[in-house]
């Protein structure tokens, strides 16, 4: 075992949601996602259809490995030596397994990148819970690693500028006669209103949806668009529970009925093209658009880009300097703390305001992959 005694950060853990990588993994993955939530087995069968449609493979693990490869390349370009590990909440490689490997390798003081730009329970606090679980697991093995989670990065200049370029790329793909009239629509994962109200500190108020709206405004401004929409997708809770609205497909239908012929849809809430992007947008939204002879250009996500890797290394350097360097927004960008501690007093409340993410009445019932 390597002996590392320095207080400097000596590793990065990319911590994500996880997803199956074969037909035989779909059902146990879904059982992990919904454990303790009382979801009927037949609902899991319904949701599994989405994954089996794509060969039983969620793209999220491969996309995260691509992010890791890009981060390693960016670290090397800055003459940095920092090993990068990969762990998930719901599927292999599990966070506990990654933490064990890190401890075995002699890691003492690791940074954690959660694959979410946002505040709130699902986007931030649940990753803090994952970190606490990893620490508890290591303690049961007689091992120890200190984990420091990186902050929320929804308004980092590289995030905004790269998303703006990707939006412009989508506009360029539209037919000439539709480009000027195309409507720009930003979309992010819907959550229950109670969860949004609890996001951030009591003083923040609805931090998650506010961050999504601010990021969208920053990107639109960079593109040169003054009028745009922010909508939501992937709702999967009880139909009796209020969630963030409107839904992207419902909104597209409404716009079309008012005469809109073209949309540029930017999945600002998602780092990579995982299941909810390729199902809810590339399948369901596109099918509805085709029925209506509506042209929709879906904007690429930021995760696979070199600029996103540079953003991650920027965040690492911020953590080393113990101060935030680059921000464009005015809202809080919380989320950084040690060993899963609350990042701010009262942040995200004490209750888990999320509901089970498999719903028989939802348009899309695929589990979330933040």
Curated annotation (Swiss-Prot):
Catalytic activity as recorded in UniProt: Fe-coproporphyrin III + 2 H(+) = coproporphyrin III + Fe(2+)
E.C. numbers: 4.99.1.9
Keywords: Cytoplasm, Heme biosynthesis, Iron, Lyase, Metal-binding, Porphyrin biosynthesis
Chain sites annotated for binding Fe-coproporphyrin III: 58, 127
Pfam families: Ferrochelatase
S-adenosyl-L-methionine listed as a keyword: no
Subcellular location: Cytoplasm
GO MF, one annotated term: metal ion binding
One GO CC annotation: cytoplasm
Entry binding sites for Fe(2+): 189, 276
Pathway terms, separated by semicolons: Porphyrin-containing compound metabolism; protoheme biosynthesis
GO BP term (any one): heme biosynthetic process
Uppermost EC category: lyase
InterPro entries: Ferrochelatase (IPR001015), Ferrochelatase_C (IPR033644), Ferrochelatase_N (IPR033659)
Similarity comment: Belongs to the ferrochelatase family.
HAMAP family attached to this UniProt entry: Ferrochelatase
Functional summary from the UniProt entry: Involved in coproporphyrin-dependent heme b biosynthesis. Catalyzes the insertion of ferrous iron into coproporphyrin III to form Fe-coproporphyrin III.
Name of the featured protein: Coproporphyrin III ferrochelatase
Species this chain originates from: Corynebacterium glutamicum (strain R)
Highest classification ranks of the organism: Bacteria, Bacillati, Actinomycetota, Actinomycetes, Mycobacteriales
């Amino acid at each position: 075992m390597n002996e590392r005694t320095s207080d400097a950060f000596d590793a990065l853990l990319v911590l994500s949601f996880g997803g199956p990588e074969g037909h035989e993994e779909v059902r146990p993955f879904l059982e992990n996602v919904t454990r303790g939530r009382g979801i009927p087995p037949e609902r899991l069968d319904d949701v599994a259809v989405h994954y089996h449609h794509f060969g039983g493979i969620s793209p999220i693990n491969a996309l995260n490995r691509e992010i890791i490869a890009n981060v390693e390349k960016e670290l090397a370009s800055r003459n940095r030596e920092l090993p990068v590990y990969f762990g998930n909440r719901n599927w292999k490689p599990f966070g506990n397994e990654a933490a064990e490997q890190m401890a075995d390798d002699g890691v003492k003081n690791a940074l954690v990148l959660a694959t979410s730009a946002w505040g709130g329970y699902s986007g931030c606090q649940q990753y803090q819970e994952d970190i606490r679980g990893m620490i508890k697991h290591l303690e049961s093995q007689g091992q120890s690693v200190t984990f420091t989670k990186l902050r929320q990065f929804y308004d980092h200049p590289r995030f905004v500028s790269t998303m703006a370029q990707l939006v412009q790329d989508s506009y360029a793909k539209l037919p000439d006669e539709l480009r000027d009239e195309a409507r720009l629509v930003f979309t992010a994962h819907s959550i229950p209103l109670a969860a949004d109200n609890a996001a951030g500190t009591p003083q923040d108020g609805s931090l998650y949806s506010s961050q999504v709206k601010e990021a969208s405004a920053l990107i639109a401004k960079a593109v040169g668009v003054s009028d745009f929409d922010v909508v939501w997708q992937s709702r999967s809770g009880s139909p009796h529970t209020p969630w963030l609205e409107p839904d992207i497909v419902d909104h597209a239908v409404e716009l079309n009925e008012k005469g809109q012929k073209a949309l540029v849809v930017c999945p600002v809430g998602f780092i990579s093209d995982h299941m909810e992007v390729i199902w809810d947008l590339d399948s369901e939204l596109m099918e509805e658009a085709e029925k209506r002879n509506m042209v929709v250009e879906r904007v690429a996500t930021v995760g696979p880009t070199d600029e996103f890797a540079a953003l991650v290394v920027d965040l690492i350097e911020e953590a080393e300097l113990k101060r935030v360097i680059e921000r464009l927004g005015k809202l809080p960008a919380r989320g950084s703390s040690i060993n899963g501690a609350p990042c701010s007093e009262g942040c995200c409340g004490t209750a888990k305001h999320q509901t089970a993410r498999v719903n028989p009445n939802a348009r899309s019932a695929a589990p979330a992959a933040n």
